[in-house]
């Protein structure tokens, strides 16, 4: 047994440690005869022995001797500190061990403390309550004393327990057992500032001052009431120090029984001290925040308190502008837990200069200035600020805090444990910069290092030491990672201890420095958080202890005491705001700086997209947190400067989904568990990361097995994904998506349309050099990979994930951090997401679409991973082919008539039924002769009718028919189950014949009609003539009635009638009038079908026959939009892509029809694009007609399998043309992520279509109401480089699938969606007539 323990157990010493004290009252008769003097001496000696320098405040008044205790007669009749631990007979002969002295001191100091509390309650509170003095009302009395009575009662009970302990271990146990009860101090500590303020007011009043002085004299107190009121604050912050002393002297070794209890007590009380200290700091910061709010001018946002607590504030040299030089003036930075506010001092006021939400924050160091760092907004590339700190400590502190808040505000895609590991990692790995040698310096001071010794206010320090800029760049950032908490610990604990023991909340020395550093203007700051210093020491001590014990993880406070804070999320609370204020120096340069800010801001390469608010991709590289985290990796530093990748950095995303925010709060969300993916290549979402990678890499990733995998079995991938999330190898995930797409489910956050578009645009602009677009562009929703989980299980939350899983992930992150080559940021969807503008009611059908892999790996020219976090929403799964926008709207997946690929659902075919025929799932496609291919359609390789494969074919996803049952249709509902269901589905882009066929639904009928096959053959028909009937609306309603434009296109595949033939058809359509009006012949309601497929020769003109037309019947034909754009020209490869627009087409459709009637319907690729068909003169008319809602139409030059997007549109409702929007909405449902995907897909497809068009003679002007998301101008992209005609074999396809499922507990699993575009055709030389029409607002 440790010597101390033995000594304490000795009966004579009456180790009831404090028995003696209370003993007087209790039982120590023997002690009573002992002279008080002896007691005093004994007490003094232990104290003098240095048992604890922090214990200097033992006396009730702080006097070394207990003499003043005389005033406390009743309860403590005898001198309060009378206790003798030495046998009376041998006083002085045996010296108490250090452990005994410490234990005794704990009890003695508690007795003195309780005595002081009683004096406050009985001698001050009592008289004031009686109204005998000062005339204070009850409210003022409550403010002055708070819950002092409760504290007195609690402390009296604690004292009794301590006095009843017979060993040091027993004392420790008392604290452990009552640790939770100490929270009563929280209220008192938070009220203390108010109490002090009231007391000061009273001191100004002569009567009050006189009464207080008289009272002090009567009580013979050496200290005023103010000092007594401070004692509870000091005491609560001293317990952990006393216990640390106890543990320090506890004998080490096998006999050290009870040590665990002591350590537990230390941890518990340290946590209490930290918590109270933190609460106190928060209160002070809240007061400061109010002050800032009052003085801040030019701020038009909500109350600053809405952005969380004020974590740090400081004064820096610098300002806006991304130029290489620091421009003049001084900037005040106020770091809130959710936002960084930049202001400028103007006299006593602050002028608002800008703000950046923490979720969009990017921090990077400036290589040329060792003290400089740049803060930028990922969503607004031009919004950058360059600052110069006063010293290294301040810089490190700020960078660390900024990084930490970035992670904390990140969309919860990173588990809390992983975030912690990342930050800790950076802290531990970060080598201290040369300046840092003063590591001990408390970060507090550093921020204020008001006077960092070498710092000259105006000095720029332009030449950064190479060392610093290089390695530090990445690491430095992490260094600060010590976290405020850690930093605090760095403050000298001795200082803290002394301060605490002496009763000064804030060691004056520390406070002074801080305040000094702060300018008077920051008077608010001047008051250092009284607790900060102590907090620091506490943290430091805890860390020390935990490190020694190896408890670091469990210990409440290790360096990371922050853990507590972390969990509590006390953002850097540990850092006292005090750092904040730095001397202000106004500079005449300020104005200059301001002027330059604008100029220097570099325009975002993506700024062109008016809709992209957040195309801040450029800034992505700078994401501080990411870069920092990897800071260990020297290369990271470079990252910040990496060119802006179009990556989805636009976190801002176009939509803000309130519901998403909750996700962010859930660090543990299992889905997040996938975090392992993070380690993969970067923290960034796959897409970002990928974007960052050289294109080649991207290609390899995608073109390699990944594409194959993706295309081959989405379902498998999904399953795999689930597994991965479950803990399956993350590496696999990484490999798969190149960015661990699979692993991302959690991580994958919902990507805003703007992000995706930004990425795409960057690709388009050639930012990522790429040979052309020979490879398909894959936009995979995280679960694309796992396409198999049609069941939707994929989306189920992995709530069951255990903590061990979290730890594993954290470990993986830590290991990967050093491997990261790039740090990219992923958009924080969390932050301000915009609400999807027009989300329609979500489709209830939960059926997950089944996606089919397209045959063969697609060349990867680009791959963007789009992921969606689990939303608190309930969404239904939906699949939507993003066809021309119009189609999309119709939501009918065109999927190429063929059966759904997998025959999954013919739903589409049912489309006509619209009713979410998903259930319908029409019989598997009956491939028409020509169509048989359709089934394969999905597979690019599929023969697909020549063109037949509907563009949608594309895809697997295509299958999704948005409207259709949303999903499911997945496919191509195409299977025209009925004989021509295909047609319907068809869409058949291939329907070159389309022109002729044009009538979507008709087509279907057509399909039956002999022509179906033919249409299938459209390519055969060379379609050249066909141009794209695209009549998106195929059914356009003429005169408001659905008319199925059958562009007859006489050209049947073979016929190839030029389609010029105007369809008289139009007229027939009118009959259709109702969307459903025309009975579809066989169509089965495949309004979508749009299949232009059948260019039955005869049909051609005749086709227009209502019969075909019955399309209208398609009932949704109207809606249909069915763009069916057939590009006659060789549609073969027409990249259908184009048309993803949502297609408000509906409306246009009608117009279209009419015009069609006038002209060939055929031509009118109704798609809003109204792309002039080369051959079909009518296209122009159509164009006019169409208002473009249709956009989808695209003329694909020779797109062989013209996209049949068209069909898609039809869909749902037979509702009148207006319905389109409906379908669109349905598709999206409440899922903002799905919406953004659709919009992005629409944009991309339009972009591809534009590429197609030679000059795109007719750029589609039309845009859907979604247009905002898509660039308004549709200028045809630069004419596609002349390319050899698209390989006839290639077809253009595009489809998306979104699956959102509700898992147990009502939690949604991440939505999974897949969008694939095969645009090789685009590369092909655009058909002269072809135009890339569609641009429509993004699809759905």
Swiss-Prot record:
It comes from the Eukaryota. Residues 309-407 form the PH domain. SUPFAM superfamilies: DBL homology domain (DH-domain) (SSF48065), PH domain-like (SSF50729). Residues 560-572 have a biased composition (Basic and acidic residues). The modification Phosphothreonine is found at residues 441, 1215. Expressed in thymus, skeletal muscle, lung, testis, uterus, pancreas and heart and also expressed during embryogenesis. GO terms for biological process: regulation of actin filament polymerization. Residues 588-600 have a biased composition (Acidic residues). SMART domains: PH, RhoGEF. Keywords: Guanine-nucleotide releasing factor, Phosphoprotein, Tumor suppressor. Residues 34-44, 703-714, 820-831, 907-921, 930-945, 956-972, 1049-1059 have a biased composition (Polar residues). GO terms for molecular function: guanyl-nucleotide exchange factor activity. Residues 1276-1288 have a biased composition (Pro residues). Residues 45-62, 1319-1333 have a biased composition (Low complexity). Residues 98-279 form the DH domain. The modification Phosphoserine is found at residues 446, 465, 1219, 1269. Residues 34-76, 431-623, 684-743, 820-855, 907-979, 991-1028, 1047-1069, 1125-1146, 1250-1340 are annotated as: Disordered. May be a transforming oncogene with exchange activity for CDC42. May be a guanine-nucleotide exchange factor (GEF) for RAC1 and CDC42. Activated by the binding to subunits beta and gamma of the heterotrimeric guanine nucleotide-binding protein (G protein). Involved in the regulation of actin polymerization. This is Pleckstrin homology domain-containing family G member 2.
């Amino acid at each position: 047994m440790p010597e101390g323990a033995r000594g304490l157990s000795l009966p004579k010493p009456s180790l009831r440690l404090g028995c003696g004290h209370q003993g007087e009252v209790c039982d120590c008769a023997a002690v009573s005869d002992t002279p008080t003097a002896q007691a005093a001496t004994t007490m003094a000696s232990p104290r003098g022995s240095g048992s604890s320098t922090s214990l200097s405040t033992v006396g009730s008044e702080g006097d070394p001797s207990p003499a003043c205790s005389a005033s406390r007669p009743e309860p403590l009749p005898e001198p309060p500190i009378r206790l003798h631990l030495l046998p009376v007979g041998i006083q002085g002969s045996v010296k108490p061990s250090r452990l005994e002295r410490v234990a005794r001191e704990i009890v003695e100091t508690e007795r003195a403390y309780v005595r002081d509390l009683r004096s406050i309650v009985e001698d001050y509170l009592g008289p004031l309550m009686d109204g005998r003095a000062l005339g204070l009302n009850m409210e003022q009395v409550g403010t002055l004393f708070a819950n002092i009575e409760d504290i007195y009662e609690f402390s009296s009970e604690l004292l009794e327990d301590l006095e009843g302990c017979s060993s040091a271990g027993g004392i420790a146990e008392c604290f452990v057992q009552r640790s939770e009860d100490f929270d009563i101090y929280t209220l008192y500590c938070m009220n203390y500032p108010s109490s002090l303020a009231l007391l000061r007011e009273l001191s100004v009043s002569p009567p009050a001052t006189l009464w207080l002085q008289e009272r002090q004299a009567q009580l013979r107190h050496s200290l005023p009431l103010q000092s007594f009121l401070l004692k509870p604050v000091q005491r609560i912050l001293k317990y952990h120090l006393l216990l640390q002393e106890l543990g320090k002297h506890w004998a080490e070794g096998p006999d050290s029984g009870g040590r665990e209890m002591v350590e537990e007590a230390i941890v518990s009380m340290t946590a209490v001290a930290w918590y109270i200290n933190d609460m106190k700091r928060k209160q002070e910061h809240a007061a400061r925040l109010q002050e800032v709010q009052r003085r801040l001018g030019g701020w038009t946002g909500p109350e600053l308190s809405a952005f969380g607590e004020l974590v740090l504030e400081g004064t820096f040299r610098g300002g806006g502008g991304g130029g290489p030089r620091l421009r003049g003036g001084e900037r005040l930075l106020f770091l809130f837990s959710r936002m960084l506010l930049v202001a400028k001092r103007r006299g006593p006021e602050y002028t608002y200069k800008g703000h950046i939400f923490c979720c969009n924050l990017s921090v990077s160091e400036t290589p040329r200035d060792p003290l400089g760092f740049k803060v930028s907004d990922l969503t607004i590339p031009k919004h950058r600020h360059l600052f110069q700190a006063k010293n290294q400590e301040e810089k490190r502190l700020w960078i660390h805090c900024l990084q930490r808040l970035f992670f904390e505000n990140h969309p919860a895609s990173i588990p809390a444990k992983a975030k912690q590991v990342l930050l800790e990692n950076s802290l531990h790995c970060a080598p201290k910069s040369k300046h840092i040698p003063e590591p001990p310096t408390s970060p507090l001071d550093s921020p204020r290092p008001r006077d960092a010794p070498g710092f000259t206010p105006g000095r720029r320090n332009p030449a950064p030491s190479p060392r610093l800029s290089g390695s530090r760049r990445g690491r430095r950032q992490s260094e600060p990672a010590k976290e405020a908490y850690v930093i605090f610990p760095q403050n000298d604990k001795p200082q803290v201890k002394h301060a605490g023991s002496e009763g000064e909340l804030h060691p004056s020395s520390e406070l002074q420095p801080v305040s000094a550093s702060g300018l008077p203007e920051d008077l608010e700051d001047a008051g250092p958080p009284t607790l900060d210093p102590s907090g620091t020491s506490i943290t430091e001590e805890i860390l020390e202890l935990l490190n020694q014990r190896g408890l670091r993880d469990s210990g409440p406070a290790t360096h990371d005491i922050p853990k507590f804070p972390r969990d509590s999320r006390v953002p850097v609370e540990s850092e006292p705001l005090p750092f904040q204020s730095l001397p202000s120096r106004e500079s005449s340069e300020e104005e200059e700086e301001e002027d330059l800010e604008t100029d220097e801001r570099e325009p975002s390469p993506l700024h062109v997209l008016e809709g992209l608010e957040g195309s801040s991709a450029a800034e992505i590289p700078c994401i501080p947190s990411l870069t920092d985290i990897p800071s260990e990796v020297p290369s990271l530093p470079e990252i910040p400067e990496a060119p802006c990748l179009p990556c989805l950095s636009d976190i801002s995303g176009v939509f803000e989904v309130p519901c998403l925010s909750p996700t962010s709060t859930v660090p543990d969300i299992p889905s997040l568990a996938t975090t392992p993916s993070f380690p993969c290549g970067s923290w960034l979402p796959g897409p970002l990361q990928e974007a960052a990678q050289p294109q080649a890499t991207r290609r390899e990733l995608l073109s390699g097995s990944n594409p194959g995998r993706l295309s081959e079995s989405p379902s498998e991938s999904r399953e795999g994904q689930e597994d991965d999330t479950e803990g399956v190898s993350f590496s696999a995930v990484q490999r798969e998506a190149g960015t661990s797409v699979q692993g991302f489910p959690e991580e994958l956050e919902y990507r805003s349309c703007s992000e995706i578009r930004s990425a795409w645009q960057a690709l388009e602009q050639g930012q990522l050099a790429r040979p052309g677009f020979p490879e398909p562009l894959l936009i995979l929703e995280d679960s694309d990979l796992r396409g198999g989980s049609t069941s939707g299980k994929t989306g189920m939350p992995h709530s069951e994930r255990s903590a061990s899983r979290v730890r594993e992930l954290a470990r993986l992150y830590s290991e990967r951090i050093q491997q990261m080559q790039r740090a990219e940021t992923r958009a924080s969807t969390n932050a301000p997401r915009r609400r999807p503008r027009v989300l329609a009611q979500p489709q209830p059908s939960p059926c997950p679409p089944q996606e089919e892999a397209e045959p063969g790996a697609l060349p990867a020219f680009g791959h963007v991973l789009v992921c969606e976090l689990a939303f608190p929403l309930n969404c239904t799964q939906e699949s939507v082919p993003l066809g021309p926008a119009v189609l999309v709207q119709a939501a009918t997946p065109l999927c190429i008539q063929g059966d759904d690929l997998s025959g999954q659902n013919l739903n589409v075919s049912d489309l006509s039924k619209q009713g979410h025929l998903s259930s319908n799932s029409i019989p598997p496609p009956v491939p028409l002769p020509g169509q048989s291919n359709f089934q394969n359609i999905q597979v690019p390789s599929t023969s697909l009718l020549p063109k037949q494969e509907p563009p949608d074919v594309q895809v697997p996803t295509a299958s999704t028919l948005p409207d259709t049952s949303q999903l499911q249709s997945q496919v191509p509902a195409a299977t025209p189950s009925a004989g021509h269901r295909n047609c319907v589905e068809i869409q058949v882009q291939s329907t070159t014949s389309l022109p002729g066929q044009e009538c979507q639904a008709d087509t279907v009928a057509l399909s039956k009609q002999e022509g179906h096959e033919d249409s299938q053959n459209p390519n055969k028909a060379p379609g050249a003539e066909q141009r794209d009937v695209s009549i998106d609306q195929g059914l356009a309603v003429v005169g408001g009635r659905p008319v199925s434009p059958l562009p007859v296109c006489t050209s049947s595949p073979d016929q190839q009638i030029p389609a010029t033939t105007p369809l008289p058809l139009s007229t027939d359509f009118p009959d259709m009038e109702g969307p459903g009006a025309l009975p579809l012949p066989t169509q089965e309601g495949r309004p979508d079908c749009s299949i232009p497929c059948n260019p039955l020769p005869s049909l051609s003109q005749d086709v227009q026959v209502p019969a075909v037309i019955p399309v209208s019947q398609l009932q949704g034909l109207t809606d249909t939009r069915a763009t069916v754009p057939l590009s006659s020209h060789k549609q073969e490869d027409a990249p259908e892509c184009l048309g993803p627009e949502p297609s408000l087409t509906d409306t246009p459709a009608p117009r279209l029809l009419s015009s069609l009637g006038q002209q060939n319907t055929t031509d009118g690729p109704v798609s809003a694009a109204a792309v002039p068909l080369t051959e079909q003169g009518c296209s122009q008319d159509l164009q006019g007609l169409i208002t473009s809602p249709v956009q989808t139409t695209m003329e694909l030059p020779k797109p062989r399998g013209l996209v049949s997007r068209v069909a898609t549109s039809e869909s749902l409702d037979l509702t009148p043309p207006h319905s389109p929007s409906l379908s669109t909405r349905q598709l999206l449902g409440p899922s903002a992520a799905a919406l953004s995907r659709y919009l992005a897909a629409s944009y991309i497809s339009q972009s591809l279509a534009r590429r197609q068009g030679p000059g795109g003679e007719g750029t589609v002007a039309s845009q859907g109401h979604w247009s905002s998301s898509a660039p308004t101008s549709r200028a045809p992209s630069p004419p596609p480089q002349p390319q050899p005609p698209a390989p006839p074999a290639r077809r253009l396809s595009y489809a998306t699938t979104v699956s959102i499922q509700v898992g147990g507990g009502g939690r949604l699993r991440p939505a999974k969606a897949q969008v694939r575009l095969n645009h090789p055709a685009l590369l092909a030389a655009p058909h002269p007539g072809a135009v890339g029409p569609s641009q429509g607002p993004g699809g759905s």
